[in-house]
Design a protein with these regions (language model features):
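C-terminal edge strands of extracellular/lumenal beta-sandwich accessory domains
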Residues: 119-131, 136-180
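Short coil-to-beta strand junction motifs in C2/discoidin
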Residues: 55-68, 149-151
């Protein structure tokens, strides 16, 4: 499901996954939907992706304002919905969690989720798979603005992905006729 796992949160124990930009649905995070009756619903927490630096915090240059946009699409490239997360980072307390398995102090990675936007999107009946695909990221710093939208760039993080659906009834198999 997660082609670009970031790792597990040290405090929340959530699994975090990078969302990359792309042009094709197969480039995103693929979510398979079992056979279902009526619409299904995908929900997840969308976070901005921050490169944490203690040095920038100490020098009062850590400010960032992130705006990440992702789309949830069907496999034929039909956009079901867009989702946006926007937040500001100033200090370590603005992080959602730290990701374990890194070379930083305490064994954490420099990349960390910041900001949380709960997302819930209805998926029409008949869809068997959807994708979460990054569209763009805008990063505002004290000294300028960066825009990221080239394919293959990580622009956001998702966690807590859940799928709600009403299972389709099992297919009935005809009972064999008895021989007399």
């Amino acid at each position: 499901m997660c082609p670009n796992p970031l790792g597990q949160g040290v405090q929340t124990h959530r699994t975090f996954c990078d969302v990359l930009t792309g042009r094709e649905p197969a480039d995103g995070i693929l979510v398979d939907i079992p056979p279902h009756v009526g619409p299904a619903r995908i929900s997840f927490d969308l976070h901005n992706r921050h490169m944490y630096s203690e040095e920038l915090i100490k020098s009062n240059r850590a400010y960032r304002r992130y705006t990440a946009t992702v789309g949830v699409l069907t496999m034929d490239n039909t956009l079901l919905s867009r989702a946006v997360v926007q937040n500001e980072f100033r200090a370590a307390g603005d992080l959602v969690d730290r990701i374990g398995g890194g070379a930083g102090p305490g064994g954490v990675k420099a990349v960390a989720p910041t900001g949380t936007e709960p997302i819930s999107i209805e998926i029409p009946e008949g869809e068997e798979r959807v994708t979460i695909l990054g569209e763009k990221l805008i990063v505002e710093r004290l000294d300028g603005v960066d825009n990221f939208q080239l394919p293959g760039q990580p622009v956001a993080i998702v966690s807590n992905v859940m799928l709600e659906y009403r299972p389709a009834p099992p297919k009935r198999t005809p009972t064999p006729a008895r021989r007399r």
